[in-house]
Amino acid sequence: MVSIAIDGPSGAGKSSLAKALAKDLGYVYVDTGAMYRSIGLYAVRAGVDPHDADAVAALLPKIRLDIRLLDGAQHIYLNGEDVSDAIRAENIGMAASAVAAHPAVRTFLLDTQRGLAESQNILMDGRDIGTVVLPNATVKIFLTATAEA
């Protein structure tokens, strides 16, 4: 399997490049933020306070995430349900920010992201993707940009 990691600072255009490149190559683009949103959604649906690290950690063994490319678009599945639209609600974004602060969630998603890279051709972007998440990526790109036109 081929894995491409795009690292760089906020605002450098990582996501725009990653989505376009994944589409051109026919690879799955892994939106790591959507994964955090999915865990936030699960916590909200379970009635768990997303700020409660222990309660959220107790949910993790019940969560199965999968990312699939359908008709050229990424879809994220939470325990078999396509939650691609549901995770975009404002309250779920707030829950995602809360769960992302928990080390157990970060470890869980790190394992999940690496598992995805072992099972399909993927392209991931974000901070620390090439150094922490996919240190052995087939291709690593560090993207920078300036505010100048």
Task: Annotate each language-model stretch with its function.
Residues 34-121, 131-133, 148-149:
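ATP-dependent small-molecule kinase phosphotransfer cores
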